[in-house]
Amino acid sequence: MERLSERLAVARKALATLVEAIRERKTPLNRDASIQRFQYTYETVWKTAQNYLSVVEQLTLGSPSAVIRGCFQAQLLDEEQSRSALRMAQDRNLTVHTYNEALAEEIYARLPGHAQLMEEWLKAMDARMTSATS
């Protein structure tokens, strides 16, 4: 559980850097930096969820999509959040394979929603851990 608590703390810090970037004035440099922060925040959050599912729910899942589905089954995410999380996973994959200006703009526009979803996801894990240890 201690390792999971550490992962949650790291994920919250990563998310804070994304939120900070999103709040800045939009420039091409800030857009690209925000997308980069989204990439590492997403990676940190889904891997934290993977660890949570393993430790707390005894589910061993390997891919981001499987972890998202597992979080839905464990009721950490509702149906709408799960669909949004799968879309977020697609956005993350699109950001790393090629650079496309129009795509960067589209993904940048979705970052506030992605950040909100990751915040809710982390809060759900925090709440479950708190209730499990009390």
What are these regions (language model features)?
Residues 1-134:
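Solvent-exposed interaction patches of small proteins and small membrane subunits
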